[in-house]
Amino acid sequence: YFTLTSNWFVRAYNYYKDIDKFVIIIYLINQGLIYFRQNGVKIDYDTFYKDKTIEINKINISDISKDLGVPKESIRRKVLELEKEGTIKRIGKKIFVVRDTLYSSRATHTLTEIATILHEFNKILKKEKLVNEVYSVNEIIYAIKENFSYCWYQFNKFWFIYIGRWRVELKDLEYLAIGMVVIINAVKNKKFFPKNNMRLYHKALM
């Protein structure tokens, strides 16, 4: 899970050198997923990303600011930057996520990482005799892709809550990205061991 989290933030930063810009794009794309869910429409992965733009009607800066927990002026500035870069287009109150942006933000790596996590959970459930079968990572990826609009709506719903909680704590998602990289590297370091007395450890660092 921490690998998924760390990789997601690193990839988000690599897209625009600004995590909040990427979060705004994902937020806009998610409006399409919400529309499909509200209308009982199921879209698979390939159909969702094929030869299309996403049109978001009557969305304003205040809505994005409130939902993401980012000041309105910051959202306005970043949306203008995304528009100048050609990442999105605005016509009146409508915002269009252009095809190239949609295609480049495909959830390829994240999808594989989520499937890997679910596969590990599946093995635990099998070991505890709560399920009878263990599905491979590829089988899970296929199932998610076939039910993509529903599955990715649920993931984004969780992800925005997760991001929002960290934003309250740290104010800046770049700090979280750096912290995650440090944690992952520490855990993978065979010489790493937890400190028994964190208070004394922090005092020593000071």
Regions found by a protein language model. Give the residues of each.
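Short, charged/polar micro-motifs that form catalytic or ligand-binding hotspots
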Residues: 10-14, 54, 61, 65-72, ...
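Short, cationic-aromatic polyanion-contact patches
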Residues: 44-47, 60, 92-116
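A short, conserved structural fragment
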Residues: 83-94
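Short recognition helix of helix-turn-helix/winged-helix DNA-binding domains
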Residues: 1-42, 142-193
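Short amphipathic alpha-helical interaction segments
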Residues: 69-84
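Amphipathic, Lys/Arg-enriched alpha-helical "gate/interface" segment within cytosolic domains
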Residues: 42-46, 103, 192-204
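Short, amphipathic alpha-helical interaction segments positioned at domain boundaries
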Residues: 103-140, 146
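A short alpha-helical element within helix-turn-helix/winged-helix DNA-binding domains
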Residues: 46-66, 82, 199-206
